[in-house]
Structures are given as C-alpha cells and as structure tokens.
C-alpha cells in the first residue's frame, strides 16, 4: 500500500512518517485473521478473510478494505516408484542423465560400511539397483555427478586409515562403475559434503573449510584453491555452486557468497573471493540455495536450519526442528530476511528450487512442495502456499514404517527423494 499526503492547498508533502496497521476477520468462523504489514506498506494476510489496512500520519487516518482469498495451489502427489535399501541408512543422492541418454541415480549411505548404490531410473515405476561401490568409510554422506554424466564423486567419513577424502568414479557405464582415483590431501579429517562445478570439486575438510580440486584429468586430481571464513571456531556444513558463485553454509556464521568464477568481484577457483554474508540468531545454518524470482526479479538465498533438540538417535526416530529463512539479497550490501517456511513439529534438511517451486525434505515431515512465486513476505506455511506433500515409508525399510526424508531433487518433471529410513523414490 502506498500513501500520499497533501496540505490544505493540495500540495504533496514528502517525507512524513507513516504508521501502517491492519485488522481483519477470517471467512472461516473457526479461525482468526492474521498477517504482517511492514513499515513500507507491504501487507500479507495469512488467512483468507476481509482485512482493513490503515495508514496514519499524526491524527489523520486513511483506510482501505481488501479481501484475501486462498491461493488454491493444491495438487495430488503420488509415488511412482521405489528403490529399497533396507540394511542401512540412505544418505544423499543425485539423479543424472548418463552418456547413453538414459536416466540414473546414485545414493550414499550413513553410519554403515561405505557403500554407494547406483540405480537405473529410466523407468521410474521400476527403479533398479544396478551396481555398487564399497570404500573404506563408515559414511558416504554426499554424492555428486558431473554435468556430462561421466564422473561421480563420493565423500568419505570414518575411514579406518583416517585418510578419508574423496573417491572419483567412472560412471560412463552405470551398470559397471569403476573407481578411477582417490584424493585425500588436506581432507583427512573427513568430507561431509561436496559439489562439482566446471571440472572442479569443492570438498569440505573436517567441517572447517573447503578445498577446490581440479579433476580435468580424473586420474590426477590436484588442489588449486581453498576458502575459509577465517574465524576462531569456524565451521562449515555445505557448499553449493551456481553461476560461478559458491554458497557456503557456516552454522552460526550463516551463509557466505563467494565468487569462484562468476567475476562479480574477480574471483576464481584459484582465488575465491567472498562478497556477501548473512547470519541469523539460531546459528543453525545447514544449507543454502540461490533463488532468482521470475515473477518479481528479486534474488534470494534460501537458508535452512538443521536442529536435533534431543540429539541424534542413529537407529530410531528423531525429533527435528528449524525452518527455511528467505533472505532477500537483491541488494548484496544489505540482505534482509523477509519470509520463512516452517512446518510445525518438523525440521528442515535438504531442498531444491525450480520454476518458483520449493521442494523441501522435512525429515519426519516428509517432502513438502511449496509455491514461492510472487513477493515473499512473512510465514509461507500459514499463507497456504503448500502445493502438496508425501510421507514416504516402507514396512520393509531399515527403520520400518518410518519417515525421515533426507533430500529432494526435481529431474525430468519428477520429484526424487532419499529417505534415511529406507529408500530412493520418484
């Protein structure tokens, strides 16, 4: 809402302080109206109803009535196919197009025996386990595949020889994958997450910093750069790269935007340069995903929490907490947190954004699909933006009949998920 003030002669008065407020009444008599209005007059209603928005300057008030209706974005969500892992926890995954133009996936495992599985998902209603690789590790937390579908990188934690590092795998034939090489320099403390971008691997080292490794020749990888925030007690959980910008999630130190080839501040893989940062009070920044809104032109970093209030039960159900923070980075020098997606009773984990739709793994809350088009403001869950959800589980899972969704990825118009309790799904 915009206000214009005039004097008695009809001249516009600029710069006067305006106080905005609202009242409302829900269309649903069993509910109460709620919403949010900012100092600049932007208003959002959480609940369908009739609202009155008022602007006050001194003792003069002007009001306008507005009706808020439901977005009506609901869709049916159904499972097409399942690839079951029932003897260990499934961790992260990646779906990719192979060199033969068919569709494949790779999944890691957590707290187990260092196994990664490869799947044919060309027919998503008949997901087939086609090969596996076992390495010296307890956990293969992260797996990624190069854009050309030829190289897979898996992370290692808990290796018996304490070297950990990454394993480089030839997946040109996903039915017969071959280990090409390993790389352990500066990564012996364990690699929790990694990312592949333009012939480089960005690998976390002991959850403190990330090293940048050239894999142009996958038989002879070599280090070219490193990034750390340079603070005492620094910690990093994840890194994601898009358009030459790395988004590192650093727990209490929030997200860092780092030029690793975009050119915005002259950065490169050999010389990464940070140019943006945002922190928030919980100190639980676990993941970050960039989002450029097509409908508004605004640029966001969507930052996710990971919180286990009672610790982690490795072999049972877990209570989770936390939510997604939508931070407007349109002005890189003045980022502002403007919205949240919080599912009551469940915490966030990994997520994917495409075409103004958010696909978020909420652990025991399943996978939630959320409309994030238009101006984002306030509590997106309360505003009825949820398109649909699914609560995957299996009576034959590693944890029977449990839901603990780890991640989500949209691929070829299908949503794929991994669940720590049992499987890969599409």
Task: Describe the function of each predicted region.
Residues 48-50, 63-418:
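Feature marking well-ordered beta-strand scaffolds used for ligand recognition
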Residues 7, 57, 303, 422-423:
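Short stretches within intrinsically disordered, low-complexity N-terminal or propeptide regions
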Residues 11-14, 34-36, 378, 385, ...:
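Intrinsic-disorder/low-complexity peptide segments enriched for small residues
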Residues 416, 420-426:
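Single conserved hydrophobic/aromatic residue that forms the stacking wall/gate
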Residues 25-27, 32, 176, 200, ...:
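Short linear sequence elements within intrinsically disordered, low-complexity coil regions
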């Amino acid at each position: 809402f915009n206000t214009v003030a005039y004097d008695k002669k009809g001249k516009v008065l600029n710069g006067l302080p305006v106080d905005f407020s609202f009242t409302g009444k829900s269309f649903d008599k069993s509910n109460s109206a709620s919403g949010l209005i900012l100092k600049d007059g932007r208003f959002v209603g959480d609940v369908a109803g009739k609202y009155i928005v008022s602007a006050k300057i001194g003792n003069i008030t002007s009001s306008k009535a507005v009706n808020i209706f439901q977005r009506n974005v609901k869709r049916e969500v159904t499972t097409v196919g399942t690839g079951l892992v029932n003897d260990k926890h499934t961790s992260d995954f990646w779906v990719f197009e192979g060199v033969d133009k068919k569709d494949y996936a790779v999944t890691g495992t957590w707290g187990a025996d260092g196994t990664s599985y490869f799947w044919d998902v060309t027919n998503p209603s008949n997901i087939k386990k086609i090969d596996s690789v076992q390495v010296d590790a307890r956990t293969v937390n992260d797996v990624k595949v190069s854009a050309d579908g030829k190289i897979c990188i898996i992370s290692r934690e808990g290796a018996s020889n304490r070297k950990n590092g990454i394993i480089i795998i030839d997946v040109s034939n996903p039915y017969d994958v071959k280990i090409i090489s390993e790389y352990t320099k500066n990564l012996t403390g364990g690699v929790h997450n990694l990312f592949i971008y333009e012939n480089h691997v960005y690998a976390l080292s002991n959850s403190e910093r990330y090293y940048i490794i050239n894999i142009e020749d996958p038989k002879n990888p070599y280090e070219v750069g490193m990034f750390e925030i340079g603070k005492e007690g620094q910690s990093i959980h994840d890194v994601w790269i898009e358009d030459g910008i790395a988004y590192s999630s650093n727990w209490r130190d929030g997200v860092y935007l780092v030029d690793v080839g975009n050119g915005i501040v002259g950065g490169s893989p050999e010389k990464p340069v940070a140019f943006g940062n945002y922190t928030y009070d919980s100190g639980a920044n676990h993941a970050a995903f960039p989002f450029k809104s097509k409908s508004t032109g605004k640029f966001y970093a969507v930052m996710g929490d990971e919180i286990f209030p009672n610790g982690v039960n490795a072999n049972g159900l877990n209570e989770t907490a936390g939510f997604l923070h939508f931070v407007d980075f349109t002005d890189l020098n003045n980022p502002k947190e403007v919205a949240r997606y919080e599912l009551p009773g469940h915490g966030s984990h990994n997520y994917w954004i495409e075409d103004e739709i958010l696909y978020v793994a909420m652990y025991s809350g399943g996978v939630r699909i959320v409309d994030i088009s238009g101006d984002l403001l306030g509590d997106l869950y309360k505003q009825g933006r949820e398109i649909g959800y699914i609560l995957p589980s299996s009576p034959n899972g590693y944890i029977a009949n449990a839901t603990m969704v780890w991640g989500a990825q949209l691929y070829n118009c299908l949503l794929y998920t991994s669940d720590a309790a049992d499987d890969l799904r599409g």
